[in-house]
């Protein structure tokens, strides 16, 4: 493979099955068996007490809770989230003690099993409906955040529960990955773009590390590469297969290939999740290229690449990728669409991943070429964005209040007619004018991260409930 790609991380859940002494034990035993079957059917790894660790391998007493907590602490680095299963009323103190002693500080999903109308006798009645309320109350008292299922109760083997687990997995991935994220910064921001300034210190205290490198170091490494290097040739072939390049000179593709190879090595050597790049003006003056196509390829391979050294925008891209499992992009809030107050044009010039487009081709940069000339600005990706639902996210470090904040909304790309350049699409957002007022009044940048998926609720829950970020969620 000529370009590295990030593999989606394997998700491991910690499982706690509850029980309560005055309710039928066989329900807890069967519940443990069922949740294991669901985990294996869905392909998840899990950490759970063995049947000989406690009575049936479930948690009821304080001694049970200690055993569960010790097991979870041994697997602290691998467990991404915890699922509480309540086959009967279950003991709220057992759950709370296990969570408090383990002290993993990760997302928690609470499932409670439904009673069946024809099985409401003493042997079969669960009362998990009531028990779930009790568990939630106690976790609230302990200050332990948790997630709820789409229905208050349902069977462990229901499709609804499986869908909720998939949703919960995304929340877990966002929380776990952001707490140890490593992002690269190539060069300084363009001098004209104060809008993309950010606080590295605020990010660091939230677990996000920035690894900087000067653009001159990248260019210096490029100068040491030979044109006939087999790795360079591999990159050239990949770029040509990625998007049509018929109007693109071989010299330009060679430069893109070398740039890609050097940045790829830097990403691997520093174990980076994503990077932002000074894409103008220095690289045109000193290397004679625009890096948009290279950035598009990295983003398509699940290594988000943001332009104009927009680290805050890059974080938005990374979050949306974690929430959706698919590539993300960064765009400008760019134009009105006629007189429609709820439609606008999202645009960049562009480095969008190929999967965003109906079709693509490589071109000279439509804007920078007017300033620098066509010979120095090969490498942009052009095309229209697909007609699909979309989630938009802007992250900022607010130095005034010492916090991370974000703006989040959802919309739909349309097929309204538009003849323009770059990477673009018409998007409809309910009550768009109010959304724009929020963006302006709160000092958000003109960049917005995007994914072609509806993941707003997942992002909102992860960022607010588990990371404590200040998120403005604009929705219909």
Question: PLM features: what roles do these ranges have?
Answer:
Residues 3, 8-14, 46, 116-234, ...:
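Cap/lid and interdomain-hinge subdomains that line or gate substrate/regulatory clefts
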Residues 2-42:
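N-terminal basic/disordered segments at the start of proteins
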Residues 78-88, 109-111, 272-278:
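Periplasmic-binding protein-like
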Residues 33, 373-476:
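Extended hydrophobic packing segments that form well-structured cores
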Residues 57-77, 255-262:
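Glycine-rich, highly charged phosphate/nucleotide-binding loops
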Residues 96-125, 133-138, 296-309:
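Short, acidic/small-residue loops that bind anionic groups at enzyme active sites
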Residues 234-237, 241-323:
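Long, internal scaffold/assembly segments composed of regular secondary structure
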